[in-house]
Amino acid sequence: IISNSEEETKLIGRKFAKGLKNGDVIVLTGDLGSGKTKFTEGVLQFFGLENEISSPTFNIVNEYVKEDVNVYHFDVYRLEDEDEFYAIGGEEYFEKGICLIEWGEMIEHALPNKYIQISFSRNLEDENLREIVIEEINK
């Protein structure tokens, strides 16, 4: 999927969110500024949670709760290793709602056996262009 702007990346997130349900784990990979948080904004917009979005860089996880859905937005970039993820009870969130995990490749062994990986990459010639690849992972 090609995105030409931040707004388009959010739109892709909104469309993707239509198929999500509690228990889904989505791993977002890509360099800083590649669109992971904008995509997450789109997912949150779909669920009517857009007013609260912030990157959880300093918190590790932000919780967005609504009566019919819980969305957990992780940023595990600052974790030393998977043990730290276990120490915060990270894996307990997997069954509580929908989990979006930025930099999830850093905690690969802590991830469930089945998850969705979304990779974001920037185009070197056009700073607004993003390539987004969505794949289902079964370990």
Stretches found by the model and what they are:
Residues 1-15:
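N-terminal pre-Walker A segment at the start of P-loop NTPase domains
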Residues 17-23:
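Phosphate-binding P-loop
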Residues 26-28:
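Hydrophobic anchor at the beta1->P-loop junction of P-loop NTPases
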Residues 32:
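The conserved Walker
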Residues 36:
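Conserved lysine of the Walker
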Residues 45, 91-139:
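Short phosphate-coordinating micro-motif centered on Lys-Gly-acidic
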Residues 49-64:
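Short beta-strand-centered segment that lines the nucleotide-binding/catalytic pocket of NTP-utilizing
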Residues 63-105:
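Conserved nucleotide-sensing/catalytic segment adjacent to the nucleotide-binding pocket
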